[in-house]
Curated annotation (Swiss-Prot):
GO terms for cellular component: cytosol. It comes from Burkholderia ambifaria (strain MC40-6). Keywords: Cytoplasm, Methyltransferase, S-adenosyl-L-methionine, Transferase. It is found in: Cytoplasm. This is Ribosomal protein L11 methyltransferase.
Amino acid sequence: MSYRELVVELAREHAEALSDALLELGALSVSVEDADADTPDEQPLFGEPGLVPDRTAWQHSRVIALLSPDHEPAVLLAAAVNDIGVTETPKFDVREVEEQDWVRLTQSQFEPIPIGERIWVVPSWHDAPDPDALILELDPGLAFGTGSHPTTRLCMEWLEQSVKPGQSVLDYGCGSGILAILARKCGANPVVGIDIDPQAVESARQNSERNHAEVTYGLPDACPAGEFDIVVANILSNPLKLMASMLASKVKPGGRIALSGVLARQADEVAAVYARYVDISVWREHEGWVCLAGTRRESH
């Protein structure tokens, strides 16, 4: 017997309460999305880190609850609506969810990714298409960075062209560790990866061990005091601007820095902030995202 999805559309002031009530009544999982997504009425909810959101739910929300076969959707919804004090049952729909081999289905969605001239990012369940290439074995996980996003790809292409053996590299906002691992495989040493998320740091350590790449990882307070030949930061434009002085100070005079997580329309603003410290410009653009790259001046 198949599982079912209960799909409910309602105003934002009731979305969170209904989600909690459905979970308390036995729903296996609940998610909330914008009911106006992919329409002219779609609303952005969360901005970049450092910016305060002006709302906590979409004006027109869609609550999706996954139910086991022994739950009757209409009965469960009526009970949840009653629990939160809503007098009228909102519009809803029920979808059948067939049982599948979810592991196999998920794996089928992730194929080896070629990047640059000789890099392949390969999930552990795949064989490397070219065993002589520079192989990074990486599975999709909780930490950002598998090579599929344009910003990750841009940074990897830049590192492939820029890193020389023996150079020191700092990957600030390392996520999965993909950039730090690549730098090490390109011959950089030492390589340091820093992230504010302890889970990302642990994920990066595991990925480095899997790839036999010696990288030192830690939280921001563990960042070494010295300067690096290369600093790379694939974050977002607002944090990059806030950290400009600190990140620039981690680059040796004459050393290089690469920044991504920046939309093409944000490039001039980010570059203007960093121009106080480095000679910087757009290195490459891909699918609306850019990688900014530059060199720290000998004195500033």
